[in-house]
Amino acid sequence: MAPRPRARPGVAVACCWLLTVVLRCCVSFNVDVKNSMTFSGPVEDMFGYTVQQYENEEGKWVLIGSPLVGQPKNRTGDVYKCPVGRGESLPCVKLDLPVNTSIPNVTEVKENMTFGSTLVTNPNGGFLACGPLYAYRCGHLHYTTGICSDVSPTFQVVNSIAPVQECSTQLDIVIVLDGSNSIYPWDSVTAFLNDLLERMDIGPKQTQVGIVQYGENVTHEFNLNKYSSTEEVLVAAKKIVQRGGRQTMTALGIDTARKEAFTEARGARRGVKKVMVIVTDGESHDNHRLKKVIQDCEDENIQRFSIAILGSYNRGNLSTEKFVEEIKSIASEPTEKHFFNVSDELALVTIVKTLGERIFALEATADQSAASFEMEMSQTGFSAHYSQDWVMLGAVGAYDWNGTVVMQKASQIIIPRNTTFNVESTKKNEPLASYLGYTVNSATASSGDVLYIAGQPRYNHTGQVIIYRMEDGNIKILQTLSGEQIGSYFGSILTTTDIDKDSNTDILLVGAPMYMGTEKEEQGKVYVYALNQTRFEYQMSLEPIKQTCCSSRQHNSCTTENKNEPCGARFGTAIAAVKDLNLDGFNDIVIGAPLEDDHGGAVYIYHGSGKTIRKEYAQRIPSGGDGKTLKFFGQSIHGEMDLNGDGLTDVTIGGLGGAALFWSRDVAVVKVTMNFEPNKVNIQKKNCHMEGKETVCINATVCFDVKLKSKEDTIYEADLQYRVTLDSLRQISRSFFSGTQERKVQRNITVRKSECTKHSFYMLDKHDFQDSVRITLDFNLTDPENGPVLDDSLPNSVHEYIPFAKDCGNKEKCISDLSLHVATTEKDLLIVRSQNDKFNVSLTVKNTKDSAYNTRTIVHYSPNLVFSGIEAIQKDSCESNHNITCKVGYPFLRRGEMVTFKILFQFNTSYLMENVTIYLSATSDSEEPPETLSDNVVNISIPVKYEVGLQFYSSASEYHISIAANETVPEVINSTEDIGNEINIFYLIRKSGSFPMPELKLSISFPNMTSNGYPVLYPTGLSSSENANCRPHIFEDPFSINSGKKMTTSTDHLKRGTILDCNTCKFATITCNLTSSDISQVNVSLILWKPTFIKSYFSSLNLTIRGELRSENASLVLSSSNQKRELAIQISKDGLPGRVPLWVILLSAFAGLLLLMLLILALWKIGFFKRPLKKKMEK
């Protein structure tokens, strides 16, 4: 298992990557994207994979790594030097560094070494270039230890750095062969020995081999130190003959090899691993000794590989179970890696490769029982970094790809042990294939301590960063930072930087380029940590702009050539700490996102500020083209030098097949001042005439000062374009420039260090003279695409204010005291009618202190009102836009002044609300103490009802019914026609007026029965319009006469001569719910029940039918004239005078006698019956 060369995109189709000037800029500051210098190389060589700016005595260069140079067979890789600033464009030159990168005394394998995939400059001169897949051969194995070349300033390889510089196959191997008679054919054993020995590097300082053969007895074929080369051992092995024997004394053979073959007398070396390979084809005859013999081997740390040949068992068709168990017991643990079985002698050659690999895997560790690699697959140089004292080399393949960091200082090399970077808090997360050393860096704390930082992006699947310190050559872990998302490759790129240039590290940036966004694309994220003492604390995270991916729904419309390529941005694939680009005194950060824009790529520039960077990027530089010929722009970045001699840091950006050098543009500092004469507007002191009117004129002096940030002492001449806007806070200006009657003027000016110009303007006759007049000047460079850029830390707009002179005596501020009084036409309840829908509010505003400038009343009102006008002040004093603002007084309301006016409203029939709500306030631009503000506000809320305009009609088909004197009552009623006359009642409701028709309830009442229960009006039918839902209290045709049911009349029900009086009749009611409609109609059919009237005594009477209408909406009411309707049906009887009842006659006679007696009594009392004249005559 080997890691990818980086968490960066791979190779695309072969094409030339020409970074022509087809770069477009989304957000621009001072990195010039239109005049870049480009370098091109073969895409298949991954030219542009790494870039570094470089300078030596010969000049300035861009170094470009091309790790696959030598395609397709010999991909050794290399570094190109590309000249900069030579006047004419010169080609890049390959340095051929791999040729001179070498380690003595090993068999080197430089194919596929990917030299140039790591490239860093040495702060003391020269640079370091690495090939992490550099390998050397040990036997038949290739160990990819990796290598780095320390290159001098003159491009000469000074020395090569590699953690392992020789084959460390220090093994003493004794092969114990079963030579008994059952082994057949012996040639197969000889072939097995030949193939196995060919794979070994045999020599006094490498592997030594001895062979022991046993059967009934044990023979030493040759000792460990007998031969000093592989060739000699191969010759000797071919001469070995089968010794034979009827017994297989396996325990004897193993024990003899332990006691004798591994002695110093026979060539065994102290401290060298002991390996025994036992080959046998049958169960031992001394197996009772095996357990002790094997334990003795264990005690002496002899690694044992056992091989069981099953040929004799298979030929004899015998069970192998017991034999296999015995041979397994001989093998070391774990058994599955140390035990082999083959079907017969001929099959021995099939296990040679696997056996050889497992034997030589023992060389990679000092652990006698281990069979894994330590530094043999380390890929040292996968990353590199120069700290203050040490060179840090990432070795991601070390310790079975757990990884490590090799530390080098001069001739001292520290290779940490496998457990060095295991911290207590993370032991529960086993670091399997963590790739520690994927990227390395260092930081300087404020205390002066140097902190070393390494990333392991596969740790616990989420990634981790380790911060440690070197103490007397030992590593002490201080802190770990963990990623948050599985597979994000957190820690695959690290960068530290000193933002404020105080020589102390301020922030650490950790890239997670495969961080998945919301749409499951590899968006990428960069985490920013601030250094506090010796600990890093999370500060913020950075993300790219949103990218659109090739989803299943839009797969056919994607422009990406290979739609199976990763989608997103991979923001954070490269992070570079660059020197101050914008000349603001703070260093900056550049981050690459090589998969943006369909793999075209882009980079983001973040400016420093204080001790960190700003979260929003200052400039984004995307790659140009269609994403097919331009790939992965931003996969490498470097920006440390001024390469064109203008004193500005330039930025080099690499992509697949090329790189571009972007020049920084100088930053122009432009300062603008504006002065005015007079500096205040006094509307009472006119000083000029404009358009035939006296007004106030003002002269403005505008001055420009310019300089360059990089050359502050040099005189700089700038061509500027500027625009002045008068009263820029107002939509309608209160001033115009003289001679143009416009509020804006635009001019060009050339400024050499400093320059001034003049403009004049005048004030218009406007009501608002409280707020100051703001004058705005906007400026820019005449040619913003070339030359310096404006300093983005300074505004390119200047605002100055001209205040108005105040009528406040000697005080600078006017302190007013406004009061508001409000009166309305109604206070308790408003009844709104169509003919009378007006509502008025009277306002009185008074000021009792200093003049109140721009005094105004603001009226907010509920939606059921519509502003219709004002009275008593000028009509243009009020503006209505959802609320009403009325200016009171001009230009101010003086002390003691009072203004009364009236606001007129109409009701809005579109909004029927239960209340009229009005909020009124009086305010001004002058100040008013909080304690006097209470009388500036009035709230009004009045209940309101709306009188619905409608027409309520009622009519009847019959108003008079006459009953003949000779009419009789039919004994049997067969139909309703036998009953009497039909009366049809009609009700009609029609909308009139502007208010909507509410839901109504119509109640129809008619006399149904006499007080004695005799029918009067008999209901036979009910019909209505569609919007009416009627519910009669009695059923139509309750006696079911129309259905054919016959009915008899009986004189027992009503005796002839009964006097009929309908004032006491019982009434029936029909209720109809009428939904809102312009017209509603209800018809009721009734029949006069003649039998009741024929048998009764009366001459004439009236039957009253009542209709009552009621609104179901509390806000919509009906006028009293539209609530009730009555219909009177007169019934008369021909030929019969009305008969007076006997009780009436008797009562009348009694009343007459009583009255006569009372009259006589009264006359008697007054002496009416006395004769005074008679008495006088008698006297």
UniProtKB/Swiss-Prot annotation:
GO terms for molecular function: collagen binding; collagen binding involved in cell-matrix adhesion; integrin binding; metal ion binding; phosphatase activator activity; protein phosphatase binding. Keywords: Calcium, Cell adhesion, Disulfide bond, Glycoprotein, Integrin, Magnesium, Membrane, Metal-binding, Receptor, Repeat, Signal, Transmembrane, Transmembrane helix. Residues 161-360 form the VWFA domain. Integrin alpha-1/beta-1 is a receptor for laminin and collagen. It recognizes the proline-hydroxylated sequence G-F-P-G-E-R in collagen. Involved in anchorage-dependent, negative regulation of EGF-stimulated cell growth. Disulfide bonds join 82-92, 688-697, 703-756, 808-814, 878-886, 1030-1062, 1065-1072. Heterodimer of an alpha and a beta subunit. Alpha-1 associates with beta-1. Interacts with RAB21. Interacts (via cytoplasmic domain) with PTPN2; activates PTPN2 phosphatase activity towards EGFR and negatively regulates EGF signaling. It comes from Homo sapiens (Human). This is Integrin alpha-1. GO terms for cellular component: acrosomal vesicle; basal part of cell; cell surface; external side of plasma membrane; extracellular exosome; focal adhesion; integrin alpha1-beta1 complex; integrin complex. It is a single-pass type I membrane protein. One of its GO terms (biological process) is cell adhesion mediated by integrin. It holds the Pfam family FG-GAP. It is found in: Membrane. The integrin I-domain (insert) is a VWFA domain. Integrins with I-domains do not undergo protease cleavage. FG-GAP repeats lie at residues 30-91, 101-160, 365-417, 422-475, 476-538, 557-615, 619-679. The chain crosses the membrane at residues 1142-1164. The lineage of its organism: Eukaryota, Metazoa, Chordata, Craniata, Vertebrata. Ca(2+) 1 binds at residues 498, 500, 502, 506. A motif (GFFKR motif) lies at residues 1167-1171. Residues 1-28 form the signal peptide.
